[in-house]
Each structure stands twice: as C-alpha cells, then as structure tokens.
Amino acid sequence: MGRVVLVTGVAATLGARAARRLVDDPGIERVVGVDVLPPRDDLGDVRFVRADIRNPVIAKVLAVEDVDTVVHMSVVAGAGRAGGLAAVKETNVIGTMQLLAACQRSSTVGNLVLKSSTAVYGASAHDPGLFVEDMPPRQLPLSGYAKDSAEVESYVRGFARRRPDVAVTVLRWADVLGAGIDSHDSQLGQYFRLPLVPTVLGFDPRLQLLHPDDGLAAVHQAVVVMRPGTYNVAGPGVLTLSQILRRLGRATVPVPVQGVGTVGQALRRASDLELSSDQVALLTHGRVVDTTALRDRFGYEPRWSTAATLEDFAEATGRGPLDARRIRSVEQRLVAAYAAARGPRGGTHDA
C-alpha cells in the first residue's frame, strides 16, 4: 500500500504546488489537500477537502483518509483571502495546535513536515554573521510572522517529545521570491514590486533568497526520504538590499529609522503591503543562515543561488525604471497617507 499525504494550505500557490509535486510521485498513492477556501490553482489529481484546521474536524480527515504523512504549509506571513491579520494569527497558531492535536491522536501518522521560516531567528544589530539551526535568536521576535513561526516551532517540538515515534522535519525557508507567489507567502516579493521602495536610512542589510522550486524540492525530499531534524533552506550567496534594488531598477526613498513605523502605516493605506515590525527589522539588519546541515545531513543542495533567484524574479516581473507617472502617483499617495498617519499635529510618533 502506498503513502497517503495530507498537505495544508493548498488554497495558496505554494501549498498547491507542493501537493501537485507530491501527487506526481509514483511512490505516493494519494495526496489530500486541505484548506478553508477552494484553491485558485489547478490541483490535478490531488483530492481537495474543504476544512478549517482550526476546527477539531481535521482529526476526522486524518482518520477517514488514512493519512501517514502531514505536510503543514499553511503558516503564512500576511493576510490572504481568508481575512485580516487576526485570522492569519489564528490560522498560524491555533490552526497548528489543532492539527498537532489531531496528529497526536492519530494511529497512522508517522511523518510530519513543517514549512517554517528563518524569520524565527529575528533580526537585530547583535546577530552573528551566520545563523545555524541550534542558535537562539539574539532578540526574540515580538510580533507578526516571525513570532507566529517561533510559536509554531515550539508546539512542534512539544509534539515531537510526546510522539517520538513520528519523524518530524522542520524546514526553515529563507524569504521565498518567485513570480506568481501569493503576497502572504512572500512579503519581500510584494515589497520589491513597489514602484517606489522605502529603505532604512544608513542601513544596507544582507539578504538571502529562496527560489520556490528549491523550497518545494526540499519539502518533497522530507516526505519521501524522511531525515528528521531542523534545516535552514536558502539559496547560496548573499546580496545587499541596495544590490537587489539596483538590479531590479527600483526607485528608492531612504527613511530615517525613527520614521519607519509611520511609513509602515502609510504603506498600508497606499498599497496592500503590510510592513510589519519583523519585516522592518529584516530590512534594517538583514539575516544570513548557514545551510551546511541541509547539504550534508539532509542531502539536498539548492539549485538556485540568491542571485539567480533574483534574476528569475526580475525576468518574470519586469525590471528597470518604471513609468514616471506611476512613481509620482504612488509618491503622492504615500505622502498623503504619511500625513494622515501622523495626525494633524504629528501626534503619532515612533518610540
């Protein structure tokens, strides 16, 4: 009898692609895709079950489908079709708790794969040059996706202690960048699409990127090879933010660090971008991780470097100076939103 894999988060592009990749594997008998909303992408032969992982009904899905492997892809960075940031927080944290509770009671689940994020390391002025998997963050993430990811990983570690018979693999993805990736899966991609990009004055952070093909290949390998552990997943090489923006041909507006919070509020009014505190920290201090364990212990070497990932993104989304009228329009909206965020007397101040 072949493997039966359940994939969460298939309404988003990355979850759908993960499920389609797995269903094409001849060693896997069936793939079940779960989400609270119907998928926009074609799932092919994946069996879709509309279910909310925040609801205990997910335990019934595991039992009825006789699932032996769970791939948790629905921890996301930003608001999607399902609602605002409160709904994202609930899905990320409460949804994971319910899913793990269902896995703990299951007699068939023997493999759990979590798509996590290098955001768990945070970003601060005191960070090491490279984060390895067993390093704690120098400054704990206080909000947003980074905090959610850290909480989710803590619940997964607790599950692993209670169910030592289950192989648990945590894949900490660097910031994924690719054409067609949902904004709540790639806040950095949404940021790089801005025609006028705000940067933190006086800082030029080092960044790593991950091509979605490499991230999904690592997920696939975690399902079929089962080498439990925690692994950083990132493309080789590093680029500074200024190098990235030059290669994309984006216009920039440097902002003093004291005004970044207000600019974040302005961006929420002028565009769909949610510039959270963890994103601001990343765009100030950067983050670089070591991928030796991924290569030597897990047995996977990313095929796309950070530079090649950026090049692929640029080719797909366009590069070079954007239309001047569009830049002026965004600039005017940003200035107006900035003024509104500050209030009539500049009453909104950053701490």
Which residue ranges define each predicted feature?
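NAD(P)H-binding glycine-rich loop region in Rossmannoid oxidoreductase-like domains
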Residues: 51-94
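NAD(P)-dependent short-chain dehydrogenase/reductase
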Residues: 159-207
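Active-site Tyr-X1-5-Lys
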Residues: 141-169
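Glycine-rich Rossmann NAD(P)(H)-binding loop
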Residues: 8, 176-178, 200-205, 231-239, ...
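Conserved Rossmann-fold NAD(P)-dependent oxidoreductase catalytic core, especially the SDR/UDP-sugar
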Residues: 97-144
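Mid/C-terminal beta-alpha module of Rossmann-like enzyme folds, strongest
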Residues: 215-277, 291, 311-313, 320-332, ...
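N-terminal Rossmann NAD(P)H-binding glycine-rich loop of SDR-like oxidoreductase domains
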Residues: 5-27
